[in-house]
Amino acid sequence: LKQTKELVYAIKKSCNIKLHFVSRDTNEKNLRMILNFGHTFAHAIEIKNNYSKKITHGEAVLTGMILAIKLSVIKRYCKIKTLKLIKNFYDKNNLTYTLKNISNSKWIKSLLPFLKQDKKNDDEKINFLLLNKVGKTSLPNKFKISVKQLEKYCTTISRY
């Protein structure tokens, strides 16, 4: 976000949105889980990088959000134009994500062992929050995907 005024507005707006969700779901059992969008992939990225300074938490989350949106497109929960809109927003505002790796199916597959470690998983399935459109995610725990299914999606994810 190029202008300081716009940046301050975006930060205030983000904080107010987060406060809205946290105050209505203090135990993180339902509505508040929406704030985890992108974090399943992000935490895998951070673990893979040994929490090094190569990638910040914010960059990992931005990358995780793009991967989650790509998965949303594959699952036909989201339209590709939404993915393009968000990628354009990132680019326009110089928001960094690991673009060079995000289209590499081997790199995406290398996240699988770390995705298995996510605390939100159950029954050998990985829980993902997917995006339907800007501002609207899936209900928590709606998309449970096995590691085998996700492995099949890796090549497709890399194409978008």
Model-found features: residue ranges?
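C-terminal charged capping/lid subdomain of soluble metabolic enzymes
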Residues: 77-160
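Active-site segments that bind and position negatively charged phosphate/pyrophosphate groups
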Residues: 1-109
